[in-house]
UniProtKB/Swiss-Prot annotation:
Cellular localisation: Secreted; Membrane
Alphabetized GO MF terms: CCR6 chemokine receptor binding; identical protein binding
Residue pairs linked by disulfide bridges in the UniProt entry: 37-66, 44-59, 49-67
Protein name: Beta-defensin 1
Keyword Transferase recorded: no
Protein's gene: DEFB1
Annotated keywords: Antibiotic, Antimicrobial, Defensin, Disulfide bond, Membrane, Secreted, Signal
BP GO annotations: calcium-mediated signaling; defense response to Gram-negative bacterium; defense response to Gram-positive bacterium; innate immune response; innate immune response in mucosa; positive regulation of flagellated sperm motility involved in capacitation; response to bacterium
Residues making up the propeptide: 22-32
Length: 68
């Protein structure tokens, strides 16, 4: 009986985390912007992009630039 309560409690916690929208699903198929930038050959920089590179997107939830 305790096992069923423990499983129900765990399920409720899991669903409440998913409903809050705190990027819980990032590891379940959605790729972060940092991963996509590096995978496409770019660099994530907080400062301006170096000469001869262009901004291709953002990194770290829009806090940095993806330079390529």
């Amino acid at each position: 009986m305790r096992t069923s309560y423990l499983l129900l409690f765990t399920l409720c916690l899991l669903l409440s985390e998913m409903a809050s929208g705190d990027n819980f699903l990032t590891g379940l198929g959605h790729r972060s912007d940092h991963y996509n930038c590096v995978r496409s050959g770019g660099q994530c920089l907080y400062s301006a992009c170096p000469i001869y590179t262009k901004i291709q997107g953002t990194c770290y939830h829009g806090k940095a630039k993806c330079c390529k």
